[in-house]
Amino acid sequence: DICDDAVAQCSMTLCQLCYNTEICELSVIGSCQPPFS
């Protein structure tokens, strides 16, 4: 799903779309560029 894609691709657009979801909190933040790091 879109959150899996965000984790896999570390896409800022996808991070925005699934920001504040648990998978982004745990798996994307810290891997993506600001403001999602």
Swiss-Prot record:
- GO MF entries: pheromone activity
Cystine pairs: C3-C18, C10-C32, C15-C24
Say if the entry is tagged with keyword Iron-sulfur. Answer: no
Identify the keywords attached in UniProt to this record, alphabetized.
Disulfide bond, Pheromone, Secreted
One GO cellular component this record assigns the protein to is: extracellular region
* InterPro entries registered for this protein in UniProt: Pheromone_protoz, Pheromone_protoz_sf
Where would you find this protein in the cell? Answer: Secreted
Q: How does it assemble?
A: Homodimer.
What is the protein's known function?
Mating ciliate pheromones (or gamones) are diffusible extracellular communication signals that distinguish different intraspecific classes of cells commonly referred to as 'mating types'. They prepare the latter for conjugation by changing their cell surface properties.
Query: Under what name is this protein listed?
Result: Mating pheromone Er-20
* Organism per entry: Euplotes raikovi
